[in-house]
Amino acid sequence: MSWLSLTFKVGSDYVDSVSDQLLEQGALSVDVHDAGEGTDHEQPLFGEPGALPEQFWQQAEVTVLLEENTDVDEIVQAVARVMGISALPDYQLTQVVEQDWVRLTQAQFEPIKISSRLWVVPSWHDLPDPAAINLRLDPGLAFGTGSHPTTQLCLGWLDKFLKPGDSVLDYGCGSGILAIAALKLGADRVMGVDIDPNAITASLENARNNLCDLDKLSFTTALSFSGGGDPADTRQHPVFVVVANILANPLIMLAPVLMSALQPGGRIVLSGILETQADEVLQIYSEWFDMQIAAKDQGWVLLAGRKSVNRTS
């Protein structure tokens, strides 16, 4: 079995209408990404809450998956009509052959060495170091397989600075990787929070797969957390370490929440922040924390600091 893949470029004004037209004509999928990706013309759009980015890239590349027997000329002509031109100036057509997609996907994920004692290992791989702390994580419903620089920055900080017996809040837990790592590294009480219920489901599954003690590790939605409905409510039992690997704008908005969850003298770790955004985040958090850029990787930064011992709220 095989399919056809049709790729062409469109301006931002036509992305919606072209995509709708393609789906109406039977496209199996429509993928839209930055036509300048990987070049000096790349235009990052993060879609962060609180930000107002352009809806689409100025120039987008559209890739359409079609049934093998599709009349491609008809598709191309329909796209041209939507764009108000007589013909598409350029497009590429390739054949997509049936493959073992599971094996192909698995091949993209290799064990990741965070430190001499900490690894992230997909479940289908043998353990490179059975004596190490091995986090078994597979790609799934939520962010956090260990491959992204921000996840590795946070794992590296936990590996170096987390003390046995610490209490930890992982805000924006995604797959639960940081919360699970904290527990494995000796934390006594860990709570993961996420806005997405799917992330809570994924985190619990990953915690069970890693044989975590669920009496010490819990996950809850941000709604339950902010409403105080969780028995591990940090307003009653503030933690010593808060780690949040999200994005800059949500971190700015969450500053009072994260501050109130932390004990006086406690430590805060933030990532998901581009180098160009670091000063803005530092300025907001400096009201409560002695913060600094603690690490950098591939244009991303990790901010770390302590809450003033004189601040209780």
Swiss-Prot record:
Q: Does the keyword Repeat apply?
A: no
Top EC class, one word: transferase
Q: Where in the cell is it found?
A: Cytoplasm
The superkingdom listed in its UniProt entry is: Bacteria
Tell me, in one coarse class, where this protein mainly resides: cytoplasm
**What is the reaction catalyzed?**
L-lysyl-[protein] + 3 S-adenosyl-L-methionine = N(6),N(6),N(6)-trimethyl-L-lysyl-[protein] + 3 S-adenosyl-L-homocysteine + 3 H(+)
Keywords attached to this entry:
Cytoplasm, Methyltransferase, S-adenosyl-L-methionine, Transferase
Q: Which GO terms describe its molecular function?
A: protein-lysine N-methyltransferase activity
Q: What EC number(s) would the UniProt record show?
A: 2.1.1.-
Question: Which family is it part of?
Answer: Belongs to the methyltransferase superfamily. PrmA family.
Free-text function comment from the UniProt entry: Methylates ribosomal protein L11.
- Give the protein's recorded name: Ribosomal protein L11 methyltransferase
Q: Which organism is it from?
A: Nitrosomonas eutropha (strain DSM 101675 / C91 / Nm57)
This protein's gene is called prmA
